[in-house]
């Protein structure tokens, strides 16, 4: 009974983060994790691997929320997207923005928790990545090759 209620509450959140569709997350995380194993040192510390995976999930979720905020009205009219949580009013816009800012804050904390040696560079790169992440969804309207912007966003995961 309690799990059923919890599922009803969490389902739209997982959907807006696209955590119910892991393909995009895997495509993002594989290069980021490869970069950890390609460093000249020994195997990476598993705490760092964990932080990169969690940070990647948070940032990709943040990007998906930004996409749904940008496209809310369009998504309602498209068969493939009309059941997304914002388009179908399962989640309201205030909650979506709150979740976006929560993920942004948690991602910032994860970046601050990275080893001191590369922390400030990672933080700098994270701040450089943020505008790209937030404008990518709108780029489908004004840029002929929005996938280029998406690849820049995902490339930051390797650099960080």
What kind of feature is each model-predicted range?
Residues 54, 72-126:
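Multi-pass membrane catalytic core of lipid/isoprenoid biosynthesis enzymes
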Residues 32-39, 107-115, 133-137, 157-160:
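Structural signal for membrane-spanning alpha-helices in multi-pass inner-membrane proteins
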Residues 31, 35, 51, 55-59, ...:
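Alpha-helical transmembrane segments in multi-pass membrane proteins
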Residues 2-27, 73-99, 134-152:
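Interhelical loop and helix-boundary elements at the membrane-water interface
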Residues 40-44, 72, 112-120, 138-145:
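Transmembrane helix-loop junctions in multipass membrane proteins, especially transporters and channels
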Residues 37-51, 121-129, 133, 148-160:
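Functional transmembrane core segments of multi-pass inner-membrane proteins
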């Amino acid at each position: 009974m309690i799990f059923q209620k919890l599922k009803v509450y969490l389902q739209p959140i997982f959907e807006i983060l696209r955590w119910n569709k892991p393909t995009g997350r895997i495509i993002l995380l594989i290069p980021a994790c490869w970069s950890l194993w390609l460093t000249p040192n020994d195997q990476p510390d598993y705490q760092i691997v964990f932080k990169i995976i969690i940070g990647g999930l948070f940032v990709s979720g943040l990007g998906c929320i930004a996409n749904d905020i940008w496209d809310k009205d369009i998504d309602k009219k498209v068969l493939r997207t009309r059941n997304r949580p914002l388009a179908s009013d399962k989640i309201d816009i205030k909650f979506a923005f709150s979740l976006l800012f929560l993920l942004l804050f948690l991602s910032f904390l994860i970046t601050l928790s990275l080893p001191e040696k590369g922390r400030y560079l990672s933080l700098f790169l994270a701040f450089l990545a943020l505008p790209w992440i937030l404008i990518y969804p709108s780029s489908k309207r004004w840029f002929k090759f929005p996938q280029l912007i998406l690849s820049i966003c995902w490339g930051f995961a390797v650099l960080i």
